């Protein structure tokens, strides 16, 4: 079985400007591409798992998100030779979405659905994998999926509540040195 780095996107890989949905609004956090390169070199599959309720709220479309994902994948390949194994997203919200997107689902973090799907699709051993997130919902999803190591990003002085088995780091760039 393989192992993976499950990564939230906004606030972990890129600056969270709020509902980032286009290449023009996307800005890598310092050291994030290089850290992804180090994780890949250490054998981790790179899997991005991101709540994207902006789709359900009507702020942007899944087509917009797919274009942004391609942009991110292309940038990472060009910058540091990283191949993103998969992008997973949840477009739903339980109270603030429209139409079919308005629902309680199993994919929206803190539910582990996106991670469990990645585990199935890529034959991943969760116990040998890591999760990096900036919110409690990320950590809870990783824990529920049985991910072996959980990292909470504080983003330079932000408040990070660490629970049992959670390692706090200033940014994604610090994770490879913890492994």
At which residue positions do the language-model features occur?
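Active-site neighborhood of HAD-like aspartate-dependent phosphohydrolases
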Residues: 1-47
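Asp-based, Mg2+/Mn2+-dependent phosphohydrolase catalytic module
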Residues: 3, 63, 67-86, 95-131, ...
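Active-site flanking residues adjacent to catalytic metal/cofactor-binding acidic residues
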Residues: 7-9, 50, 132-134
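Anionic group-transfer/hydrolysis microenvironments
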Residues: 10, 52, 111
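Short, flexible segments with low predicted structural confidence
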Residues: 10-11, 89-91, 114
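Metal-dependent phosphoesterase signature
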Residues: 13-30, 55-64, 79-83, 98-106
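Substrate-recognition element of Asp-dependent hydrolases with the DxDx(T/V) motif
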Residues: 32, 36-69, 83-93, 142
